[in-house]
UniProtKB/Swiss-Prot annotation:
It is found in: Secreted. Keywords: Cell adhesion impairing toxin, Disulfide bond, Hemostasis impairing toxin, Platelet aggregation inhibiting toxin, Secreted, Toxin. GO terms for molecular function: toxin activity. A motif (Cell attachment site) lies at residues 39-41. It comes from Crotalus ruber ruber (Red diamond rattlesnake). GO terms for cellular component: extracellular region; plasma membrane. This is Disintegrin rubistatin.
Length: 61
């Protein structure tokens, strides 16, 4: 993984994340970036800009 130093098992300097739907090239994706398209309505899940996780929009749990 280019975001981690294999020798130390730690993140490389400047890396914010190593994986996740809201992680792109070791950085958190911008707030509002669609990370999961809704198949039911138009309330797509979007990145927060603060995490690599893709939070649910909360409407359907």
């Amino acid at each position: 993984n280019p975001c981690c130093d294999a020798a130390t098992c730690k993140m490389r300097p400047g890396s914010q994340c190593a994986e996740g739907l809201c992680c792109d090239q070791c950085r958190f994706m911008k707030k509002g970036t669609v990370c999961r398209v809704s198949m039911v309505d138009r309330n797509d899940d979007t990145c927060t800009g603060l995490s690599a996780d893709c939070p649910r929009n909360g409407l359907y749990g």
